[in-house]
Regions:
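Outer-membrane beta-barrel initiation region
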Residues: 24-97, 109-110
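Residues that define the transmembrane beta-barrel architecture of outer-membrane proteins
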Residues: 50-52, 68-72, 99-103, 132-136, ...
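Transmembrane beta-barrel strands of outer-membrane/channel proteins
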Residues: 58-60, 87-91, 121-125, 152-156, ...
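Outer-membrane beta-barrel architecture
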Residues: 73-77, 104-108, 139-141, 167-169, ...
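Residue-level signature of outer-membrane beta-barrel architecture
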Residues: 78-80, 109-111, 142, 154-156, ...
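Repeated loop/turn-to-beta-strand initiation elements of outer-membrane beta-barrel proteins
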Residues: 81-87, 113-119, 146-152, 175-180, ...
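Detector for outer-membrane/organellar transmembrane beta-barrel domains
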Residues: 133-194
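Outer-membrane beta-barrel "beta-signal"
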Residues: 209-214, 244-258
Length: 258
């Protein structure tokens, strides 16, 4: 019995490998597709698309009875997530005279390790009814703690003149559509520019409180109250030219996003 089992195992060891090789030799080869060149691969994520954005934070009429004016403050950009071209513009029109005309074109890029802030660099031109001035600009823009919109900017021009602007606002959602927005803007100058009515130090403040209703995600009318005033040497220039040094005004306008 044992010799018979040993003979069967011996025959299996001799014959089975040859049989397996014969079966493999007769099996047809599986065709292999030629790999797609890496240059033809699609991008795994569409993370380099060009987008556009435009917003008007102020597009409003201002009045206190004797004095009525129109003010705009808007900005927009075009670019990718990492590289953008910003355009900003603001100004005030009173009795057909434009003042505070400030227009900027800036290159924008995220600040490493600062999730909600970008640095911006470019040029600013003061273009209104007064003398034209040109500046180089450098600043940051983004969301500070508790999502407070914060935008400090530093300017320099010929003659070593330096200026700074600090502005910000906060959107407090009372409901899903009702928004209360406090806002402030301050301007500083290192040297006086009498032709433009600007003195040294703190030049002016514009601040207000607006209440808007967001009918859609692109449109929200609002009403509010603002104070705009000049200080120090700028206030002296205002008095000498017969202009008020401070105004309290009611406002009505629209916020726009696109």
């Amino acid at each position: 019995m044992r010799s018979r089992l040993a003979l069967q195992l011996l025959l299996a060891g001799v014959l089975l490998p040859g049989f397996a090789m014969q079966v493999c030799a007769q099996a047809p080869e599986t065709p292999v597709d030629v790999p797609t060149p890496a240059s033809d691969w699609p991008k795994p994520v569409k993370d380099n698309r060009v987008f556009t954005f435009v917003t008007f934070d102020q597009f409003e009429g201002r009045t206190n009875g004797p004095t009525t004016s129109f003010r705009w403050d808007g900005q927009g950009w075009i670019g990718t997530d990492f590289n953008k071209l910003w355009i900003k513009s603001e100004g005030t029109v009173t009795n057909g005279v434009t003042s505070d005309g400030d227009h900027e074109i800036l290159y924008d890029r995220p600040i490493p390790h600062m999730r909600y802030f970008d640095w911006q660099a470019g040029a600013r031109v003061d273009l209104d009814s007064g003398p034209t001035r040109a500046w180089l600009a450098l600043g940051v823009q983004g969301l500070a703690r508790y999502f407070f919109n914060f935008e400090p900017t530093f300017y320099v021009r010929d003659g070593g003149r330096v200026a700074g602007r600090l502005q910000g606002y906060y959107d407090l959602y009372l409901t899903q559509r009702l928004i209360l927005q406090p806002q402030v803007e301050m301007n500083f100058y290192s040297q006086a520019d009498r032709a433009r009515g600007i003195g040294t130090g703190l030049s002016d403040i514009d601040g207000g409180l607006r209440l808007g209703y967001q009918f859609s995600r692109k449109f929200a009318p609002y009403v509010g109250y603002v104070y705009s005033g000049t200080f120090g040497q700028t206030a002296t220039f205002s008095r000498q030219s017969g202009q008020p040094t401070g105004l309290n005004q009611f406002v009505f306008g629209i916020w726009l996003w696109h």
